[in-house]
Structure formats: structure tokens, C-alpha cells
Amino acid sequence: MRRKVDLARRLVAVALCLAIASAGCGHSVLNPVLHDPDEPPSPGKRSPMLKVHLKSGELLVLDSWRLSDDRSRLEGTGTSFSVRREEGARGRQSVPIDAVALLETDSPEQVRPFGTSALAVMTTVFGALSAVCAADPKGCFGSCPTFYFPGEDEGRPVAEGFSASIARALEARDVDALFAGRPDGERRLVLTMRNEALETQAVRRLRLWAAPRPPGGRVLADPAGRLHAALELVPPAGCRAPEGDCLSAARAFDEKERVSGADASDLATRETVELVFPAASGRVGLVVGARQTILSTFLFYQTMAFLGRGAGTFLATVERGEVDPARAMGMARVLGGIDAEAAEGDQPFRPIGTFDEAGPIAGDVQVLPFDASGAGALRVRLRLAKGHWRLGYLALARLGGRVDARALSPVSVEKNGRRDDEALSAFRAGDRHVVTLPGDVHRVAFALPGPARDLELFLESEGYYYEWMRGEWLSEEDPGMALLALTDPHEALRRLAGPFHEREPGLERAFWSSRFRK
């Protein structure tokens, strides 16, 4: 086992060294932009050449290109480069789309052998565009598409999509409860999807799942996505955290949240929150409504800063499968979720599940089902990393049976105020991506099978995004710390505890004040 761990670390180190080496010392930022392989940009003055990063590690630089009629191949004229960027054949080129890791547009002078110049695959922003988060670039708003009810765009979003999908190799399906949905009688639901971050977002699918609510109850999803009828929701009788009573934050699904500061010496340090519920028997579940703090976003941004000019090239190695994608999320994995244990009367505690929903924006509400015997008051213990979670709602659900939901595809889509049938078709089919840029707004409408007040609604989104490198981060490039973050996240969390602790008080405010709007 030790050999496997050492080998994995060496592979990451090699990939990282190549990434940093490819950036070189004389870096010149020319705003490279990523594109979905299925949707290459049209040639023109703004895109005079196209870099085609292949999954094999090779590269094509094309000065003209097109998709084949059946959209299965990318064809054009240009030059091929080996894995070490040695120049190969010139002339006509043709590659299968499924062999492409990334597409990139910028300028041809960026292509050089390893060790002499940049071969970035990230958009880098300076000046006015990044001024929205100039106060603290590590506090910039970001983390996937955000969703709002109409007229509520200035408040907190009701959902955020695929927060952990920071690359195409990490594309994932995300389902979030619209738990705070308005209980009206309308049979139509409109959601506003925004790209409010300095990101390129690629959305493959959007749809709703509608489940009939039991009389006077709710429908809750467990971490595996199974739906359960919640016949009754019982608030806790007591809530104790290290700072004292936390009952007011836990009893209702509202704006009140319980949160602590991160540990100043080790960001992985755990804390305990204790709950007490009346005795219960039968099938029950702990209901957890929570979202992450800005800590996880800060660590992601800091890792990108450490990678610096090599961030894009390292990302390409992830896309090609040379590095386990999970290693890019190493510090987040160490921070972990909210581990829950339960005990009845004088019985010992037993684990009942883990809540672990990525993202600091909207969070989610889930249930952790377990069986209770009624032997005495029900005690629940939550273990979580200090400063990593905001607890907004805690309850005990009396569960009924499993519930089936009906999938609802969009019936109309508008982009930036204009009808967009192409996006509608993509969201419904899920066979291609709709690419959004900062400031883009989509209004997505769904027809409901009954009055909204009688339905539990869940939003499914599928896709990925690429964060844009901030020009201010390039001065923090540190290959040693980048390697540490990717190969020894425990030690990285100890070293980053001090820097985060110093900036923690203002990060949340900077995050929410830097939403990007056109």
C-alpha cells in the first residue's frame, strides 16, 4: 500500500513539474480561453488559431478548422506537436472529437517547447473585469451556476449546480432540494440561472424532479438521492456547540445559521455539535440543512495561485487521466462533511450517515435515515471541521415509505432576454453543453403536473466549469506548495491555517459583494 501511495505522489509530482516547466519564466498573459470540444469556436480575427489538447498529451495548433458533417471529427490545417512539444507534421489534420481533452484559443507565439514559454489553458483576467473582487481576489464570488426564483435575484440563490465539477473530467450530476420554494398554486415554475462568477460554465442538462408531498409533510432526499416521505418534522429540544447554545439557528429553515471560526493552527481540526430530540421509534431520519463556508473556495483559489502559470497545463493532465481527478480536491476531502451519530437513552453512539454537499452559496437539505427504538431521549452528535460548515436547519423526521418522483424537462428557455431554442434542446436532451460566460442569464420555465404547494421539487443540473485565473494570483506561484496541496493535503491544511485565519473575517462579505452582473 505504501508503494502505491509513493508512486501516486511521484506521478502527481511529475505532472506538476511538467506543468510549471511548461509555463517558463518569461510569462506573457494573452487571455487564453477554453472551449467545449463539441463546440469549437469559429475561426476569425478574435480566434486566429486553435490549440487542440489531445488526451494522449499531444497538441495540434490549427489555423483553420471545422467539425465534420457528422460532428465526430475536428478537421483543419496546422501543425502537430509531441507530448514534449517537439514540432511534427504540418498540413492537414483530423482527429476524433472523443480524443480531445481541451480546446483553447489565444495566439500562436504561446506555443513553445517545455521550459521556454507558456502553454496555458486558462483564461486569465486583469484590470476592470476582475475589479469586482479586487478587494480580496481570494474572496471572489464563484462556484458554478446559481439559480433564483424570479424577482429574488438580490437574495441568496435557491440552488447552485455541480459545485465540485471544476473540470470536464469531474463533470457530475447534482440534485438539490428547492426546500424553500414558495407554496403557491401555480402549475408553472420559472428559475433564473446566472453565471455570476469569473468562470466558463458548461451546462449539459437541467430538469426538475417533482414528488407528491404527504399531507402536512415533506419529501426529503438522502445522500444517495433516494426520496423519503417525511410525515412529521420535529425540531430539536436542545443544541449545544463549543460556543454555547445553538438552538435558535437550528430550529427553523431561515436566514439564521450556526458557524464557527476555523482553527488557527490546523484547518482540519474537528468540533462537535450536540442535539437532543424527544424519544422516537421506527424509521426516522436526521434532517440537515447546511452549506459550506468560504473556506473550501479559498483553498481552491489558493491551489490555483500556487499552480500559477502551470494551472492550465496541470488541468490538461487531469483531463487526460494522467492524475487522479480526486487529487485535485485533496484538501476538500480532508475537511470532509458533517458526520452524524445517534444514541438513545444510555446506549452508545452509532454512526447514521454523513452530509457532504459542496458549495458555499445555497447548500442543500438532506435526510440521514436510521431506525430508532424509543428507548429514551434521542441524542445526536455532529462532527465537522471547524469553520467549514454553516448549519441552518436541523430536525428529526418521522419517515414513511420511499417516494417516486417525476422528471420534468424545461418547456422554454430565454438567454439574456431572448428566446433560445438551442439551449432548450440541449437542456432537454443532455447530449451537448450550453456554455455560459460571466454575466449570462437564462430563464428556464417548467410546467408542473399539479399545484406547486402539493409537490416537493428538486433541481437536477449536470455539467462542469473552469475557473478563470486571476492576474493577482500569479505573484503567488509556488510549485512546492502546489505539490504539497496535491500530495499531502493534511500538511497543506496546517500550513494554510494561519493565512486563512488572518483573512477569514472579511472573506464572506467580499464573496457576496463580488457577484458578477452585466
Regions found by a protein language model. Give the residues of each.
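Hydrophobic alpha-helical membrane-anchor/signal-helix detector
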Residues: 100, 110-135
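Extended, hydrophilic extramembrane loops/domains of integral membrane proteins
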Residues: 73-106
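Bacterial Sec signal peptide processing site at the extreme N-terminus
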Residues: 19-40
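Activation corresponds to long, low-complexity, non-globular regions
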Residues: 128-375, 389-518
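Short beta-strand-plus-loop segments that form exposed binding edges in beta-rich domains
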Residues: 381-389
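Hydrophobic helical h-region of N-terminal Sec-dependent signal peptides
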Residues: 12-20
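Post-signal peptide N-terminal segment of mature Sec-exported envelope proteins
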Residues: 33-61
